[in-house]
Amino acid sequence: MAAAKTDMLVSPLQISDPFSSFPHSPTMDNYPKLEEMMLLNPGAPQFLGAAVPEGSGFNSPVEGSEQFDHLAADAFSDMSLSGEKAVIESSYANQSARLPSLTYTGRFSLEPAPNSSNTLWPEPLFSLVSGLVGMANASPSSAPSSSPSSSSSSSQSPPLSCSVQSNDSSPIYSAAPTFPNSSPELFPDQSPQPFQNASTASIPYPPPAYPVSKTTFQVPMIPDYLFPQQQGDVSLVSADQKPFQAMESRTQQPSLTPLSTIKAFATQTSQDLKTINSTYQSQIIKPSRMRKYPNRPSKTPPHERPYACPVESCDRRFSRSDELTRHIRIHTGQKPFQCRICMRNFSRSDHLTTHIRTHTGEKPFACDICGRKFARSDERKRHTKIHLRQKDKKADKATPVSVASPVSSYSPSASTSYPSPVPTSYSSPVSSAYPSPVHSSFPSPTTAVTYPSVTSTFQTHGITSFPSSIVTNSFSSPVSSALSDMSITYSPRTIEIC
């Protein structure tokens, strides 16, 4: 009686088909005992190593090899190939709606009879394999040995494989991969499938994601803005960079606005800012100008000054556009001209030019009177006015000195040319004049003499016995001639002499 050792990894689909073509079948008496022994033994993968002693027929390579010579190796290879083909076709046919495969692992011994022709042995074999289901699922480890044919067949269809090998120096059935070795190969078709879907989900994921982000581009666009390389970059962006792409899309929105819209918005914004700045600064600058020039006359009539200031509170008009531009800078506070030496800004270019002269020391404007040089023409003009005021003061001082000289010369002449035996008295100069009466025995003509208040007056007290004509002639002639010159310059005062 010969014995054979078998390791099998089969599915319910292979229970009836592969073993139905065997030429010989074992007897029915030994299967109940074998099944009972395998159920009672908790270590199913180590069943043969623990229960079968050494020296038995399981490990003897010589015994039993002659009895199985009639089993050709071609029959087993054909069975293996046909079984793999059926498994592949069934697995592809039921790939969409198949259940997880069940793996049955077991080792059993066969004692075939040479003259037996019973073909009903797969039925007790099915009961044997069904009894080993729990033991196969509970065993965490098994022998890792496998033949090249079993590894090649398991790589093609891992969950369903059955390989056999016939050799003179080895048992009929070779060890097949057990559950722990086949579990990494069984579940990659199931567990990596959702993982593969998750990893490959990046391919269909961007199409629903980027159209949502592209909805933000619903603004008026010019075809020149849409460059092909930008669209290609959007399609190549991965799902991890999607938030940054959304941020870039928001930042690119203003650049996709038409140029006409940008220009209109910029013009409107600049006008609004100009109005705000003008109204704000006009409250600061304009009142001072209005107080300084309340009714400022203009040499040019209004119809010849077409450029008016746009500020509401300013009524200035200009005949040239550049003058209006310089004036608007007063309201806006714009200072586009900058000194490169001290970095000071100016609103007018001529102010910058005169400012640079303070750094260079250039003074092109010289005074015509004293020769003093100035950097600005208005400074020279202001300096010239100083000279004019000084000249006027000198002229005012020179006029009273020239007038006082004839008065002083008149006083001694008047005193010497008036020989009066009557005692006379000279009073101090007074600002007022009054008449001095002269008493005579006959009426005498009245003589009017005009002279200023600065001159001295003569007062004569007494009665003369000589003719009054002498007094009149000697007194009136020099006085009238001398005082007539003084009446030209000063305001006259009238003295009546009787």
Curated annotation (Swiss-Prot):
According to the lineage, what is the superkingdom?
A: Eukaryota
Note the site residues: Interaction with DNA.
305, 316, 320, 326, 344, 348, 372, 376, 382
Biased composition, class Basic residues, residue ranges: 382-392
ZnF locations on chain (C2H2-type): 307-331, 337-359, 365-387
Q: What GO molecular-function term can you cite, just one?
A: zinc ion binding
> What SUPFAM superfamilies is this protein classified in?
beta-beta-alpha zinc fingers
The cross-references to PROSITE patterns, in alphabetical order and at most eight, read: ZINC_FINGER_C2H2_1, ZINC_FINGER_C2H2_2
A Pfam family it matches? DUF3432
Q: Any keyword Metal-binding? A: yes
One GO biological process term is: regulation of DNA-templated transcription
GO cellular component terms, semicolon-separated: cytoplasm; nucleus
Annotated region Disordered: the residues are 137-203, 287-308, 378-422
The alphabetical list of record keywords is:
Activator, Biological rhythms, Cytoplasm, DNA-binding, Metal-binding, Nucleus, Repeat, Transcription, Transcription regulation, Zinc, Zinc-finger
Q: Where would you find this protein in the cell?
A: Nucleus; Cytoplasm
Biased amino acid composition, Low complexity: 139-163, 398-422
PANTHER family, per database record: EARLY GROWTH RESPONSE PROTEIN 1, KRUEPPEL-LIKE TRANSCRIPTION FACTOR
Domain comment text? Answer: Binds to DNA motifs with the sequence 5'-GCG(T/G)GGGCG-3' via its C2H2-type zinc fingers. The first, most N-terminal zinc finger binds to the 3'-GCG motif, the middle zinc finger interacts with the central TGG motif, and the C-terminal zinc finger binds to the 5'-GCG motif. Binds double-stranded target DNA, irrespective of the cytosine methylation status. Has reduced affinity for target DNA where the cytosines have been oxidized to 5-hydroxymethylcytosine. Does not bind target DNA where the cytosines have been oxidized to 5-formylcytosine or 5-carboxylcytosine.
What family, per the record?
Belongs to the EGR C2H2-type zinc-finger protein family.
Q: What does this protein do?
A: Transcriptional regulator. Recognizes and binds to the DNA sequence 5'-GCG(T/G)GGGCG-3'(EGR-site) in the promoter region of target genes. Binds double-stranded target DNA, irrespective of the cytosine methylation status. Regulates the transcription of numerous target genes, and thereby plays an important role in regulating the response to growth factors, DNA damage, and ischemia. Plays a role in the regulation of cell survival, proliferation and cell death. Mediates responses to ischemia and hypoxia; regulates the expression of proteins that are involved in inflammatory processes.
> What is the designated name of this protein?
Early growth response protein 1
Q: Which organism is this entry from?
A: Xenopus tropicalis (Western clawed frog)
